[in-house]
Swiss-Prot record:
<keyword id="KW-0687">Ribonucleoprotein</keyword>
<dbReference type="GO" id="GO:0003723">
    <property type="term" value="F:RNA binding"/>
</dbReference>
<dbReference type="GO" id="GO:0022627">
    <property type="term" value="C:cytosolic small ribosomal subunit"/>
</dbReference>
<dbReference type="InterPro" id="IPR020574">
    <property type="entry name" value="Ribosomal_uS9_CS"/>
</dbReference>
<dbReference type="InterPro" id="IPR014721">
    <property type="entry name" value="Ribsml_uS5_D2-typ_fold_subgr"/>
</dbReference>
<feature type="region of interest" description="Disordered">
    <location>
        <begin position="106"/>
        <end position="130"/>
    </location>
</feature>
<dbReference type="GO" id="GO:0006412">
    <property type="term" value="P:translation"/>
</dbReference>
<dbReference type="GO" id="GO:0003735">
    <property type="term" value="F:structural constituent of ribosome"/>
</dbReference>
<dbReference type="Pfam" id="PF00380">
    <property type="entry name" value="Ribosomal_S9"/>
</dbReference>
<protein>
    <recommendedName>
        <fullName>Small ribosomal subunit protein uS9</fullName>
    </recommendedName>
</protein>
<feature type="compositionally biased region" description="Basic residues">
    <location>
        <begin position="111"/>
        <end position="130"/>
    </location>
</feature>
<dbReference type="InterPro" id="IPR020568">
    <property type="entry name" value="Ribosomal_Su5_D2-typ_SF"/>
</dbReference>
<dbReference type="InterPro" id="IPR000754">
    <property type="entry name" value="Ribosomal_uS9"/>
</dbReference>
<dbReference type="InterPro" id="IPR023035">
    <property type="entry name" value="Ribosomal_uS9_bac/plastid"/>
</dbReference>
<keyword id="KW-0689">Ribosomal protein</keyword>
<comment type="similarity">
    <text>Belongs to the universal ribosomal protein uS9 family.</text>
</comment>
Length: 130
């Protein structure tokens, strides 16, 4: 077990990510798989790496993530949120740029509930005049 590690919890939609930052060479491990294996899309890997690229800490920390719930986009957002919070614990001076980029803010947008009488949250059944 590493002597120095920084923890952060990130959330987005239904996804929850528990992130550990350990001084290392920049490996990202998500649910015991590499980020390249876990996220097929390049955009999702980009979202995960945004806080590290912004703060210039890309090669300084190994990122160990446990994430569950939600879909791939929600999980990527949760991981970004968790990494940002862990970086803040590692170095308080990064708060300004992380906050300005919006990485410390929990995205409040959630799925809207389905209403009775409708097919989905807002989609009404087809209407026929005659």
């Amino acid at each position: 077990m590493a002597k120095v590690q920084y923890m952060g919890t990130g959330r987005r939609k239904e996804a929850v990510a528990r992130v550990r930052l350990v001084p290392g060479e920049g490996k990202v491990v998500i649910n015991k798989r590499s980020a390249e294996d876990y996220f097929g899309l390049e955009t999702l890997r980009f979202i995960v790496n945004q806080p590290l690229n912004l703060t210039g800490t890309k090669g300084k920390f190994d990122v160990l993530v446990n994430v569950h719930g939600g879909g791939f986009t929600g999980q990527a957002g949760a991981i970004r949120h968790g990494i940002s919070r862990a970086l803040l614990k590692a170095d308080e001076t990064l708060k300004g740029e992380l906050k300005k980029a919006g990485f410390l803010t929990r995205d409040p947008r959630m799925k809207e509930r389905k209403k009775y009488g409708l097919k989905k949250a807002r989609r009404a059944p087809q209407f026929s005049k005659r």
